[in-house]
């Protein structure tokens, strides 16, 4: 379903500078969309048009197929449904306290005092700032101000959230927290639209990319489609994403499997084609290209796990009856990624899981989970890029625990299971405290073994 659409959109500033020229786009509901381009390419002006802050001089914008109207009542409905977070949070935050700033939008929509309070409390809880609700915004850090601005938009319960350069002026930890929030909003159905000149962010995060230059739309498609066009990227002063650049170099050297375009470091690692050959005796009648079950290897013959089930493809058969085969290994006992929902948090339970589950690597996603771990002295090995780093550790046979909450639990579960399905590399994935019980599942030889507390 198309939620936002523009038709032949044009806008120029009073001095005659063309900011948006003949823009035609369709944005699907529930997608993560990135507008990519250098500063001055027209992204920010387009966002102000999509929110009804500016009115186009030509063309039209449609929300759920209905053209925008620019009377006061219609604009109020548009801005309730299509929220915008500016690049500079100071341009958006003006009230004496955090609570009052977040309450401004719902109050302006005519909500009752009780509903305004419920919306504000919920939004501040969601972004992890409820304890700062009475603090003046100018006393906050850059990352906290950004979260206040996001909470102000969230409190109006929009279907679409637009963010202009959402990670500008944020440190890596603050940036990771903002992206966790955006992923959670999207998980619950919100359409998320961002502008950025960071090609690495757009490539790994978005479902769909629009490429802008000199106030025009010059390309669009999936991240893999857009960022493979090296000549187009050079034309607008952008480079290929680092992960894709490394993959193409690996592919040119014949060291990569398949023709997928990896988005993340675990995806990239999974494309590597190891040289794993062996001489084996084969039975009469075996032909080149046949698949063989070699059995289980261990000790010095198992290179990735303590015990490995080995299948092999016959590459060449020698006249003496021996063959060169390419080995395909599968660890019988691999690591795993375990998720703990901190909405049901117990520090003693977490410590017991870490001890009895032999957890070697602990991460936390979201401000709430990080704060809980820190205040209770629970060791955190990683607080940014948590999902990818946990997958990499699981591939090395380590058991990992991710502390998170809300929609990020299902988001992390989905991301990790997608990796397992796509890569074909099996390791345990699950939520440890869902449905009232603590469970660590070791899926070995088809018989789950459960650790319960």
From Swiss-Prot:
Pfam families: ABC_tran (PF00005). It comes from Methanosarcina mazei (strain ATCC BAA-159 / DSM 3647 / Goe1 / Go1 / JCM 11833 / OCM 88) (Methanosarcina frisia). Its main location: membrane. Belongs to the ABC transporter superfamily. One of its GO terms (molecular function) is ATPase-coupled transmembrane transporter activity. It is a peripheral membrane protein. The keyword ATP-binding applies. Probably part of an ABC transporter complex. Responsible for energy coupling to the transport system. One of its GO terms (cellular component) is ATP-binding cassette (ABC) transporter complex. Its EC number is 7.-.-.-. Keywords: ATP-binding, Cell membrane, Membrane, Nucleotide-binding, Translocase, Transport. It is found in: Cell membrane. ATP binds at residues 37-44. Residues 4-239 form the ABC transporter domain. SUPFAM superfamilies: P-loop containing nucleoside triphosphate hydrolases (SSF52540). The keyword ATP-binding applies. CDD domains: ABC_cobalt_CbiO_domain1. SMART domains: AAA. InterPro entries: AAA+_ATPase, ABC_transporter-like_ATP-bd, ABC_transporter-like_CS, ABC_transpr_CbiO/EcfA_su, Co_trans_ATP-bd, ECF_ABC_transporter_ATP-bd, P-loop_NTPase. GO terms for biological process: cobalt ion transport. This is Putative ABC transporter ATP-binding protein MM_0462.
């Amino acid at each position: 379903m198309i939620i936002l659409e523009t038709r032949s959109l044009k806008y120029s500033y009073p001095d005659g500078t063309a900011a948006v020229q003949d823009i035609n786009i369709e944005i699907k509901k529930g997608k993560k969309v990135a507008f990519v381009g250098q500063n001055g390419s027209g992204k920010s002006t387009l966002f102000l048009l999509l929110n009804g802050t500016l009115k186009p001089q030509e063309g039209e914008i449609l929300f759920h197929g209905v053209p925008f109207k620019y009377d006061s009542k219609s604009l109020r409905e548009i801005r309730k449904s299509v929220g915008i977070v500016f690049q500079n949070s100071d341009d958006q935050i003006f009230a004496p306290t955090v609570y009052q700033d977040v309450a401004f939008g719902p109050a302006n929509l005519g909500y009752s005092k009780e509903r305004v309070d419920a919306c504000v409390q919920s939004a501040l809880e969601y972004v992890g700032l409820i304890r700062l609700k009475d603090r003046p915004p100018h006393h906050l850090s850059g990352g906290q101000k950004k979260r206040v601005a996001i909470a102000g938009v969230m409190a109006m319960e929009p279907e679409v959230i637009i963010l202009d350069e959402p990670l500008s002026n944020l440190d890596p930890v603050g940036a990771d927290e903002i992206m966790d929030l955006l992923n959670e909003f999207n998980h619950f159905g919100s359409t998320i639209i961002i502008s950025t000149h960071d090609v690495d962010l757009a490539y790994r995060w978005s479902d769909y990319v629009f490429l802008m230059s000199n106030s025009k739309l010059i390309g669009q498609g999936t991240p893999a489609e857009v960022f493979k066009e090296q000549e187009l990227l050079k034309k607008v002063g952008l480079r290929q994403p680092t992960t894709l650049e490394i993959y193409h170099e690996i592919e040119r050297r014949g060291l990569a499997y398949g023709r997928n375009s990896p988005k993340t470091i675990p995806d990239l690692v999974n494309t590597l084609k190891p040289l794993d050959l062996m001489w084996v005796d084969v039975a009469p009648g075996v032909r080149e290209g046949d698949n063989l079950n070699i059995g289980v290897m261990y000790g010095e013959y198992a290179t990735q796990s303590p015990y490995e089930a080995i299948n092999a493809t016959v590459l060449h058969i020698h006249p003496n009856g021996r063959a060169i085969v390419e080995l395909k290994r599968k660890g019988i006992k691999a690591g795993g990624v375990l998720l703990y929902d901190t909405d049901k948090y117990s520090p003693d339970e977490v410590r017991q899981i870490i001890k009895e589950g032999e957890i070697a690597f602990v991460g936390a996603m979201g401000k709430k989970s990080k704060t809980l771990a820190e205040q209770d002295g629970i060791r955190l090995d990683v607080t940014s890029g948590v999902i990818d780093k946990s997958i990499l550790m699981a591939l090395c046979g380590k058991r990992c625990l991710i502390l998170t909450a809300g929609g990020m639990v299902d988001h992390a579960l989905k991301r990790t299971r997608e990796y397992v399905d796509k890569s074909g590399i099996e390791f345990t994935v699950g939520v440890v405290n869902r449905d009232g019980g603590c469970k660590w599942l070791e899926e070995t030889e088809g018989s789950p073994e459960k650790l319960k507390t």
